[in-house]
């Protein structure tokens, strides 16, 4: 289901950064190498990225943007409201997508089952087929290197691109 991408979110030093590769695959075929899987939400104050079904992800983005507007951009309240809505609707629970949403204060993973996970370290999250490679690289770089947040995301996604066949190095990055 998620064999199509790598998305990495990172927040540190008062900054929030999200990045994703550009590869879209269907089975064993690369359909597109320059897709955009990250975007800003709520007047550019929230970053979001998705892995999984593109159609499902765009539905999730739209629904989440509606809740963000309702909660006036409060990310914490929005993810809780989103999860409650998701759990009540059996059709939403069938969506095959995951999202990372973050700002300079919070970072969350929203799963296709309506779960909301705040990473244990509170600053690094990754999803998609190359997510484990990207998060491993990001944790090591966060601990041992003195990189700017944007550089850390770039380098970590490049590691994932080297190792995951469903991830390429056509990386796009957004920053707050």
Curated annotation (Swiss-Prot):
It comes from Sulfurovum sp. (strain NBC37-1). Its EC number is 3.4.25.2. Keywords: Allosteric enzyme, Cytoplasm, Hydrolase, Metal-binding, Protease, Sodium, Threonine protease. Belongs to the peptidase T1B family. HslV subfamily. Na(+) binds at residues 161, 164, 167. A double ring-shaped homohexamer of HslV is capped on each side by a ring-shaped HslU homohexamer. The assembly of the HslU/HslV complex is dependent on binding of ATP. InterPro entries: ATP-dep_Prtase_HsIV_su, Ntn_hydrolases_N, Proteasome_sua/b, Proteasome_suB-type. It is an enzyme of class 3 (hydrolase). It catalyses: ATP-dependent cleavage of peptide bonds with broad specificity. Allosterically activated by HslU binding. The keyword Hydrolase applies. The active site is at residue 5. Protease subunit of a proteasome-like degradation complex believed to be a general protein degrading machinery. The keyword Lipid metabolism does not apply. Its main location: cytoplasm. It is found in: Cytoplasm. Gene3D superfamilies: Glutamine Phosphoribosylpyrophosphate, subunit 1, domain 1 (3.60.20.10). Coiled coil: none annotated. GO terms for molecular function: metal ion binding; threonine-type endopeptidase activity. One of its GO terms (biological process) is proteolysis involved in protein catabolic process. This is ATP-dependent protease subunit HslV. GO terms for cellular component: HslUV protease complex; proteasome core complex.
């Amino acid at each position: 289901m998620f064999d199509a991408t790598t998305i990495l979110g990172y927040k540190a030093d008062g900054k929030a950064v999200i990045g994703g590769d550009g590869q879209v695959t269907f089975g064993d075929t690369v359909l597109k190498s320059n897709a955009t899987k990250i975007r800003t939400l709520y007047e550019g104050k929230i970053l979001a990225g998705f892995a999984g079904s593109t159609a499902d992800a765009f539905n999730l983005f739209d629904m989440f943007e509606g809740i963000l507007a309702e909660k006036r951009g409060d990310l914490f309240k929005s993810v809780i409201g989103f999860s409650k809505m998701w759990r009540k609707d059996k059709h939403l629970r069938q969506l095959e997508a995951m999202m990372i949403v973050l700002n300079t204060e919070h970072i969350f993973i929203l799963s296709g089952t309506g779960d909301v996970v705040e990473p244990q370290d509170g600053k690094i999250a990754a999803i998609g087929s190359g997510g484990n490679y990207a998060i491993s690289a990001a944790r090591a770089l966060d601990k041992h290197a003195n990189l700017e947040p944007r550089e850390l995301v770039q380098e970590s996604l490049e590691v994932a691109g080297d190792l995951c066949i469903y991830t390429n190095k056509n990386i796009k990055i957004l920053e707050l």
